Amino acid sequence: MGEFKIQSKFKPTGDQPKAIDTLVQSIENGNRGQTLLGVTGSGKTFTMANIIERTQKPTLILAHNKTLAAQLCAEFKEFFPDNIVEYFVSYYDYYQPEAYVPQTDTFIEKDASINDEIDKLRHSATSALLERRDVIIVASVSCIYGLGNPEEYKKLTISLRPGMIKDRDEVIKKLIEIQYERNDIDFARGTFRVRGDNLDIIPSSSSSKGIRIEFFGDEIDRIREFDVLTGNIIGERQHVSITPASHFAASEETLEKSIRVIEDELEDRLKVLTAEDKILEAQRLKQRTNYDIEMIREMGYCQGIENYSRILDGRMPGTPPQTLLDYFPEDFLMFIDESHVTLPQVRAMYAGDRSRKTSLVEFGFRLPCAFDNRPLKFSEFESKINQVVFVSATPGEYELDHSKVVAEQIIRPTGLLDPVIEIRPIQGQIDDLYGEIQRTVQRGFRVLITTLTKRMAEDLTKYLKDLNVKATYMHSDIDTLERMKIIRELRLGEVDVLIGINLLREGLDIPEVALVAILDADKEGFLRSETSLIQTIGRAARNSESKVIMYADNITKSMDKSIKETERRRVIQMEYNEEHNITPTTVIKGVRDIIEATKVSEEKENYEDEVKKAAKKDIPVEKLIEQYEEEMKEAAKNLQFERAAELRDIIKDLKENSK
């Protein structure tokens, strides 16, 4: 069994050693909750990695969106190359939930596009938890949705070893039972094929490696792993576990028992609807449910089988669903990253789901058991936590109230200070801001501006463009990929000014930014709360020459608190730097808190340097292309898809230029 072991040239510095010791001690003392209060750029991820190494517990890291989850996953893969680091997020590229609108008598069928790659990663995550303890799973909030019973998942897993007395047809029957399909032509993930005495399987947790079971009569003679694309043998296996192709797979016995319970619930519900004189609803429910029962009986599943998950799991009505958290051992450790944003998301999930299901049940589209196919309530989520570390630069009241220990991480390894904050009047703010933009851009830096409305962001962008400023805006209407493209352009210098609303808070760490301007800073509310202001100020904490300008006519309580907190941190940082002779420096290369897509400015420099070096050393272009292709495959394997895309473009350029 592997142990967590960090591979890094860095050692904990600044506040990191103290924070690590404090939190590890608290966890070892059995405390349930603790908080890591770490400022932007202080190396919170590295601190988390050190805590994992010291405590040696299976770990779940909860992030508030897919982009940050992917970024964290890539970072932890670098820190723990010899351990298992998995990515678990919603597998829907597109999702339209089942719904009914009574006012217009409109039923909307469930419509979804499932991302096969992410589904594979989800299976890889649950498989890893069954097999090992040195597992880190980085997940989005979707991990609190029902996933199927882990006990049933374990029970249905097929365990095979060379020398076992197993009939080939018996193994095939078991594969079909756990929802694998036979396909001798289109051999893909979750399928198997039969060639003589050989049974080839592509497990649900992989798409590039297959398992070949070689039989000799009724005995397993040999188990080999092979490359699905080339067919080449990779190696021999002494044991293999084939996990179900669906997290909702169930044994024949469980399905038969479940069908009887569904039929009983249907009978009870039809009596209720008939008594209420809802004849149409009763007929609709009977027809839809009987169709589902027939599908389950014949195929082992039906469309929307998750709506019967409570019955399949054998749970009582109203009890919480089984989720990813139930796949972890009891002593697992959880980190909630950016907890001030993530926890409110967890709280909101249940209410939205419940309101949609109510009309489906009332109007005969679903049985009441559909209510129990839901995300966890916040109280249920809390009950499943063993030990947790809340991670945030601005933890909320909940985190502080539920923490025995709060470890501050204020010193940055780079020596960078929290920025200077200036307050200027709102009168003439745009003209003043234009002058500041010009001075900042002339020094080769970038500007972030935060407004209160989308309209203002768009109008200000147009105004600045008319003055020949390279400006663009970013708000919630802009999707993730477009957002990453904008950040890339900002880092490259194709854009000098980025204007946004609350999107300029968490996860936008750009070292080139030397000015953050907060317009209408004295308009008290969600976008100008103490937490929002501190997070926005943090965007200027990556550059040694940065500053923040708040345009306001009054100093609100939130402004006062955020300014005082920033000044408090700044004093601590200055004293530490003075004591240890540290000069604050802007570090662009090697800063790991940057979203992978934004590293393009570094990559462009690196690429140009590589080409120059190759030319000097007379390295053939073909050799350079080969090196980049290997790096591209490795980046894709490590979920660094934007990096892989950049390398693909570089390879394309090299091929065109070498013609």
From Swiss-Prot:
GO terms for cellular component: cytoplasm; excinuclease repair complex. It comes from the Bacteria. Residues 622-657 form the UVR domain. Keywords: ATP-binding, Cytoplasm, DNA damage, DNA excision, DNA repair, Excision nuclease, Helicase, Hydrolase, Nucleotide-binding, SOS response. InterPro entries: Helicase/UvrB_N (IPR006935), Helicase_ATP-bd (IPR014001), Helicase_C-like (IPR001650), P-loop_NTPase (IPR027417), UVR_dom (IPR001943), UVR_dom_sf (IPR036876), UvrB (IPR004807), UvrB_inter (IPR041471). Its main location: cytoplasm. GO terms for molecular function: ATP binding; ATP hydrolysis activity; DNA binding; excinuclease ABC activity; helicase activity. ATP binds at G38, V39, T40, G41, S42, G43, K44, T45. Residues 25-182 form the Helicase ATP-binding domain. It is found in: Cytoplasm. GO terms for biological process: nucleotide-excision repair; SOS response. CDD domains: DEXHc_UvrB (cd17916), SF2_C_UvrB (cd18790). The keyword Hydrolase applies. The keyword Protein biosynthesis does not apply. SMART domains: DEXDc (SM00487), HELICc (SM00490). A motif (Beta-hairpin) lies at residues 91-114. Residues 429-582 form the Helicase C-terminal domain. The beta-hairpin motif is involved in DNA binding. HAMAP family: UvrB (MF_00204). PANTHER family: UVRABC SYSTEM PROTEIN B. Belongs to the UvrB family. Forms a heterotetramer with UvrA during the search for lesions. Interacts with UvrC in an incision complex. The UvrABC repair system catalyzes the recognition and processing of DNA lesions. A damage recognition complex composed of 2 UvrA and 2 UvrB subunits scans DNA for abnormalities. Upon binding of the UvrA(2)B(2) complex to a putative damaged site, the DNA wraps around one UvrB monomer. DNA wrap is dependent on ATP binding by UvrB and probably causes local melting of the DNA helix, facilitating insertion of UvrB beta-hairpin between the DNA strands. Then UvrB probes one DNA strand for the presence of a lesion. This is UvrABC system protein B. It comes from Clostridium perfringens (strain ATCC 13124 / DSM 756 / JCM 1290 / NCIMB 6125 / NCTC 8237 / Type A).
